[in-house]
Design a protein with these regions (language model features):
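Soluble non-cytosolic domains of exported or imported proteins
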Residues: 7-10, 88, 92, 96, ...
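Residues that flank catalytic or metal-binding motifs in active/ligand-binding sites
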Residues: 1, 12, 31, 58-60, ...
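Periplasmic/extracellular electron-transfer cofactor-ligation site
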Residues: 6, 15, 46, 50-59, ...
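Short beta-strand edge segments in extracellular beta-sheet folds
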Residues: 63-69
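Electrostatic cytochrome c docking/interface patches
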Residues: 70-99, 113-115, 123
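C-terminal capping alpha-helices of c-type cytochrome domains
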Residues: 71-80, 173-185, 194-223
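Extracytoplasmic beta-sandwich strand-turn segments characteristic of Greek-key/jelly-roll folds
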Residues: 20-41, 73-84
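Beta-strand cores of secreted/periplasmic/IMS beta-sandwich domains, seen most often
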Residues: 1-16, 34-48
Length: 223
């Protein structure tokens, strides 16, 4: 089915392009551009930003997931649900850590009325259903090992997209490396317009190994 995409930018000019689905469309700060895309077959279609936009431009990849209508409706129904409070003690400790360290930029639906409410709305991805995705960190890292298996169309190793949280092989090592030192994995962009020692991107929070284990245990519950 045809899908209309609203394309915006928060910072500089980007260009949205999924070659198999349509032509390019610029993302310009302060404007909304529309682009109609349509996939003829279910699958995962790769794209790339085609406008030089900064230090990580070459790594600004995109993936569009096309599903059958019934699978899409099931995905939407799940995405509209709030995150559930974890029962596992380690995951519960991870939620407490998330509330103290991560909600400045990230949000999780159902965890937005806590004492440490998000201070920068929309500054970073909403993580309510993190584990239903195939990538993170702007599409740079694969959440599951199957994400690069198979042919160039990304068949996810034969696993249906909606089944990744239950059947996929979670790449825990890469997520731990990301939480341990994000700027070492993906350089931060300078942002001299804000009164902060940090640039744009995820800073190093200097988490201990125990804290990383707790945070990963919590993030794994976000399905």
């Amino acid at each position: 089915e045809p899908v209309i995409v609203n394309i915006r930018s928060r910072d500089v000019i980007h260009s949205f392009w999924i070659p198999a689905l349509n032509g390019k469309k610029d993302a310009v700060p302060g404007r909304t551009h529309q682009l109609t895309i349509q996939a003829d077959e279910p699958g995962i279609y790769r794209g790339q930003c085609t406008e030089y936009c900064g230090l990580s431009h070459s790594r600004m990849q995109m993936r569009v997931v096309a599903l059958e209508r019934a699978e899409y409706d099931a995905w939407v129904e799940n995405e509209l649900q709030d995150a559930e409070a974890p029962l596992d003690p380690e995951a519960a400790a991870g939620l407490e850590l998330f509330q103290g360290q991560c909600v400045t930029c990230h949000q999780i639906n159902g965890v937005d009325e806590v004492e440490f409410a998000a201070q920068v709305s929309g500054a970073a991805p909403n993580l309510t259903h993190l584990m239903t995705r195939s990538t993170y960190a702007g599409g740079i890292f694969d959440l599951y090992e199957q994400a690069n298996d198979g042919d160039p169309d990304y068949d996810l190793g034969g696993i249906p997209y909606n089944d990744l949280p239950e059947e996929g092989t979670f790449d825990r090592n890469q997520l731990e490396a990301w939480l341990r030192d994000p700027p070492a994995e993906k350089p931060m962009a300078p942002n001299p317009t804000q009164y902060s020692q940090y640039g744009r991107g995820m800073p190093n929070l200097n988490l201990s190994e125990q804290q990383i284990d707790q945070l990963v245990a919590y993030l794994e519950t976000l399905k």
